[in-house]
Amino acid sequence: MATGVYKTTKKDGSVYYRVSITYKNKHISIGSYDDEFLASAAYAIANDVLYKPGTYYIDKDMHTTSYNHIAAELSNNASLKSSNISDGTSVDFFTFFPYAKFISLINFRDNGIYIKTPIYLCDKSFLYFLNPENILTFSTDDLFYYSHHTILCRGGYYFVNDYGMQTSILSRFGIRNHSVKGRDYIFRNGDEHDYRYENVCVINKYNGVNKIEKNGRTFFQSRIHINGNYIIGIYK
């Protein structure tokens, strides 16, 4: 049996292989595989990620990683492809190595803290890598929360599953589900992926209240919805 690979049997009697690696005295689970070759390859990649920072890295300033580059390199290198899986198929190394695990391992290597969610720590902020093209920035005040909650994205809507409910990440700023970007809240620097507290500005904090500009002055319009919108009044 290859290093870091452990043969296990399921309740139905079928065999699978668990993969784990130890780094800085911490035992880290990589995943489970139905094929021993894939399990061995996953361990090899995890080992390389931890011990080859020049090849496997995160550029925190550019918000990029070497993931896509390495995946493409492996895909184009026939000697690095699997041709020995039980069913005869050929599998590229990075098609089965989780992107989130890639980020977690690099963060642990660079910052000494292992976080299960795809977070990379920066100075006074952290990056959350949903995928190679979608990276969010948060204030460190949110680190504990997102270390224990996985962010999901559907149609540009970012949310977490919190106690069985889909909760928008905007709710942490007091922004309601029906709020409209540009009217009820804005991103100060124009970056809609920057969720640091200093960048998210809540304009309308209350139900039925809209901030309006008239003749260079700011007013607040109050309205109620009863079979249509009715304006209650405009206030300074």
Where are these regions (language model features)?
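An aromatic-rich alpha-helical recognition segment common to small helix-rich domains
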Residues: 19, 39-47, 222, 236
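A short, exposed loop/beta-hairpin motif centered on an aromatic-Gly-Thr core
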Residues: 26-37, 229-236
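J-domain (Hsp40/DnaJ) module recognition
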Residues: 31-85
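Short aromatic-glycine-(Arg/Gly/Cys) micro-motifs in beta-strand/loop hairpins
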Residues: 5-27, 213-230
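Basic K/R-rich, polyanion-interacting modules in nucleoproteins and related proteins
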Residues: 1-14, 61-216
